[in-house]
C-alpha cells in the first residue's frame, strides 16, 4: 500500500507539472507570457514568488545623477555610518600596534575609506570569501591581524558566488560567518538536495510551481528564475527559499537602518543576444537594497530596487502602477550568477518523474544559445542619459539584458568602487577566481579591470577615478604576484589618472589577496555544486589563513600601512620608517617579466602548512 500510495502521489505531482507547460522561448531567451496582470492586482495571501502591482510613489522614479554624485539613499546610509567607521578605524589601526602610526590623526572625516570586493567563482568563491570576511570581522571568536577591518569598511561588493555571500549575510541580519555557515545546505548537489527520491520530487514540483506563479501573473520568466529558486534554498530557508522576500526588504532590518555594516552591492553586466561579451564594452549594473542602476557611459541613473520590473518610459509608468517583489532575493542572487543557468538547464535527474519533466521542460523551452542572458524590463527606456549607451540600445530598448559579471573576465567586482562619488581610498580585492590551468588565480581579473579603465578614460568617462598600473597577466605568474599579497598603486601620483596632487579623486590603492593553498587544495571547479562539511570547514579556514598570511603580525602591520597610504599622501604626512619598509616589501615596484621563457610556466602550488591542517 505504501508504494502504491507513493506512486499515485508522484503521478499527481507529475500531472500538476505537466499542466504548467509554457510557451516556447522567444529570441531573447525568456519565455513570453501573454496574460497580463491587472493594474490594481493586490498582494497575494501567503508566500508567493509572483511580483504584483502597487501605485507608484511619484510620477518619475528614476534618479538621474550629476557626474561624481551617488544615489541619495546611499549617501544617507554612509552619513549615518561615518560615526561607526571612524571608531572602528581607530580600533583597527590601534590593533596593528605599529610605531609611528597615529590612529587619531589618520581617522575621521579625512581618514581612509575602504571597499571590500570578493571575487566570483560559485560555491568555492562563496566559502573562501566567507572565510576571508570572518578574518576581518570583530565579532569573530578568534582575533586575527585583520580583525575589525569589516567594521571599518564602507562598501562590500560581490558577484556570482560572492553575491551569495554578500546577499546572504545581509538578508540574515548581517550575521557572522559562523552563524551564516550553519544555514548552508551544500552537502548534496544543489539540484539533487536530498538522497530521498520523494523529497526531490517535491523539490522539483515546488520550483516549477513557484516560477509558474510569476508567469501566471503576467511576467516573462528565465532560467535565472529557476536557478534563483534553487540557490535561495541554500542560503537560509531550505524549505521555501524566501519566495516572497525581496532584496529591497533588507532596508527594513535594524542593522541596515542603523548602517552598522558596509553598504552591500551586487553586480551584473550586459550582453546582447548573438554577440560576444566584452569587459571593455559591456555596461556594468549594480544593485543594493536601495537602488538598481549604473554609472557607466554617463548614464548615471538609478531606480529604487523595490520597483525593479516596472515598465517605464523616461522614468514614469504609463498607468501609474509599479511592480513590487520582482527583486525577489533568490531571483537577484540568480541574476548575478547566470553562469549557472547552463547547470540549471542541463541537470539530469531521471530518478523521479518530476525530475524528468522539469528537465525536459527547461531544455525544450530555453535555448542553449544565450542561456546565460536574462531579459528584464528596462527601467531606463526613454531616459535621456541612457541614449549614450548606444551599444546596448539602453535608451530605446524595452528590455535590459543582464549577465553574470564573472563572464566578462572581471571576476573581482572592482568597478563600483572606482566611481569618484564613492571616494574609496583602498580596495581589498579578494581573488578566489579560477583563471589558471589548475584553477588558481593568476591576476587576470586585475588586468581586465585595468584595460576597462583605460578604455573608459579614453572614451571620456569622467566618473571613474582611474586605476593603479598592474603587471601583465604573464608577469603575475612568473613573478609570483598570484601567490602572495601585493599592494598596487602605492604612489597615488603614478596611476592611470596621471601625475597630480593626491585627493579623494585619486585612484585607490588595491590590496590584492589571492587564494593560496595553506591547509587545503582549494582549486575546486566553479561548476561544483556540493561540498561536504569537512570541505566547507577546510575552505573557510583556508580563506581566513590566506587573507591574513597565516595570521602574520608583520603582514597585519603592513596592511594597516596600506590602508592609510592615501590619507598620508593627501595630508602631506611622511610615512613612518616602519611603513616605508612595508611599502618596499609589499608594493609592486613596476617590475615586469614577459620573457618567452615564461610562456610555459604552470602555477601548481603545494599546501604551505600541509593538507588538512
UniProtKB/Swiss-Prot annotation:
Q: Name one GO biological process term.
A: glycerophospholipid catabolic process
What Gene3D superfamilies does the database record attribute to this sequence?
Cytosolic phospholipase A2 catalytic domain (3.40.1090.10)
Annotated ranges, domain PLA2c: 55-593
Localization: Secreted
Which EC numbers does the record give?
3.1.1.5
Q: Which domain of life is it from?
A: Eukaryota
Q: Check the UniProt entry and state the signal peptide residues, or none.
A: 1-21
What Gene Ontology terms describe where this protein resides (cellular component)? cytosol; endoplasmic reticulum; extracellular region; nucleus
Q: Which InterPro entries match?
A: Acyl_Trfase/lysoPLipase, LysoPLipase_cat_dom
Q: Which UniProt keywords apply?
A: Glycoprotein, Hydrolase, Lipid degradation, Lipid metabolism, Secreted, Signal
What does the record give as the reaction this protein catalyses?
Answer: a 1-acyl-sn-glycero-3-phosphocholine + H2O = sn-glycerol 3-phosphocholine + a fatty acid + H(+)
Q: Which SUPFAM superfamilies match?
A: FabD/lysophospholipase-like
- Single GO MF annotation: lysophospholipase activity
Sites carrying sugar chains: 142, 173, 220, 244, 281, 319, 348, 365, 494, 499, 523, 551, 572
Q: Which CDD domains match?
A: cPLA2_Fungal_PLB
PROSITE patterns on file: PLA2C
Q: What does this protein do?
A: Catalyzes the release of fatty acids from lysophospholipids. Required for survival under high osmolarity, for normal osmotic stress-induced gene expression, and for nutrient-mediated repression of sexual differentiation.
Homology family? Belongs to the lysophospholipase family.
Q: What is this protein called?
A: Lysophospholipase 1
Organism of this sequence: Schizosaccharomyces pombe (strain 972 / ATCC 24843)
Which gene carries the instructions for this protein?
Answer: plb1
